[in-house]
Amino acid sequence: MVPMKIVSGTYGGRPLKTLEGKITRPTSDKVRGAMFNMIGPYFDGGRVLDLYAGSGGLSIEAVSRGMSEAVLVERDRRAQEILAANIAMTKEKERFQLLKMEAKQALGLLTGTFDLVFLDPPYAKEEIVRDIETLCERQLLSENIMIVCETDKHVELPEEIGQVGIWKEKIYGISKVTVYVR
């Protein structure tokens, strides 16, 4: 596996640990960099939610680029250990909250609003639609929300889900990045 690192910002260049195997599919540095160029590339505060955090690369990158804090959700115990190590690497653990549970359970417990949400679930389309509907129903999205979904390039997501619609969509190799906004 290619070594991964934070692409830019405060933590730029720092290495990220990843989990070997099929439990998580880390977003490559190239796709992550392109993804942030689509939506940013830098932020002035805000709250980020990563519902299928894996190694935490996306939310750690977002905080590195100016988000104030991140909530990372991960159910797999081995991935949680990698996540904890990657959060410790930032030396700013207080900016990250790790919820060790299923995404569906976390969605029932979360409070406040989020400005940026990352969705990269294992069963893309059905889970993305369900998760966005729940985020809208529970009023967890800020007015300026950006929801970034990473799927296989062949997955077709709906134009609109709840109160959000597709703003941008781009294919990078075998991955497709879809961004929803209000």
Can you name each region flagged by the protein language model?
Residues 1-182:
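Class I S-adenosyl-L-methionine-dependent methyltransferase catalytic core
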